[in-house]
Amino acid sequence: MKIDVLTIFPEMFTGPMDVSIIGRAREKGILSFNAHDVRAYTTNKHRRVDDTPFGGGAGMVMNAQPFFDALAAILGPRELRDPLRSRVVLLTPQGAVFSQAKARELSGLQQLVLICGRYEGIDDRVRQAWVDEEISIGDYVLTGGELPAMVVIDAVVRLLPGALGDETSAEEESFSDGLLEYPQYTKPALFRGMEAPPELLSGHHAAIRRWRRKEAFKRTYQNRPELLIGRPLPFDDQVLLAEALRELGLDAEIPEKPKKKRAKGREPRT
């Protein structure tokens, strides 16, 4: 996968893109990353990238010209671009809130271009002409789009095949299936009077899976209950959710397993 970032502070990406999972993905050739300095595409003498807003108001607005030229250099002519293979994303508070589902969607692209704004934003003609979608990482204001871009990159890269040492890690993390992740423990089993759950020490794989699933329901209900609203659950999960709620001190009825319907036209054996 190729990821390009447009920013006036490319040096902000030097450390985070060189270490841990992202750094290893680059070393393996799984990820190609470039941070492009928007100032390099300016045509004015002083390499200015901003000007006062039309209509007045506080702050400065980033010019369209350097972004247009940078995007054309990276992606080629607008009219020839295939949005199914590459996508241009503007990081902005006005965008849709980023999610694990969106990260998985973006990880299937060949190329992702992230635009980092500053000041009062970017001339809207950039959005109209080039941007495929707008993404926000939450309902709060940051100084620029660089930190949100790093969040998106981290979430996307870890989903690329081969990026993680254990491919099951991404499948079991929070939000991978709409639930928060279960609690984790490691050695020693007894630490300062606090014991690790016996289920995790039993060696019984089915019991471990059941405990983890139930704890995921507990944690989700306690911290993000909205994730459970309207969620269709198979019967086994319905039982685990009810047990989890009971263990939290709530009144929940354990569902009974539905009886199989007898096929029509067949008489019961005597």
From Swiss-Prot:
A Pfam family the protein falls into: tRNA_m1G_MT
Protein name: tRNA (guanine-N(1)-)-methyltransferase
Residues that hold S-adenosyl-L-methionine according to the record: G117, I137, G138, D139, Y140, V141, L142
InterPro entries: Alpha/beta_knot_MTases (IPR029028), tRNA_m1G_MeTrfase_C_sf (IPR023148), tRNA_m1G_MeTrfase_TrmD (IPR002649), tRNA_m1G_MTases_N (IPR029026), tRNA_MeTrfase_TRMD/TRM10 (IPR016009)
Protein's GO biological process: tRNA N1-guanine methylation
Family the entry assigns: Belongs to the RNA methyltransferase TrmD family.
Cited Gene3D superfamilies: 3.40.1280.10, tRNA(m1g37)methyltransferase, domain 2
Disulfide feature: none
Catalysed reactions, semicolon-separated: guanosine(37) in tRNA + S-adenosyl-L-methionine = N(1)-methylguanosine(37) in tRNA + S-adenosyl-L-homocysteine + H(+)
Keywords for this protein: Cytoplasm, Methyltransferase, S-adenosyl-L-methionine, Transferase, tRNA processing
Keyword Cytoplasm annotated: yes
Described function: Specifically methylates guanosine-37 in various tRNAs.
Enzyme Commission code: 2.1.1.228
Organism ancestry: Bacteria, Bacillati, Bacillota, Clostridia, Eubacteriales
Domain of life: Bacteria
Assembly behavior: Homodimer.
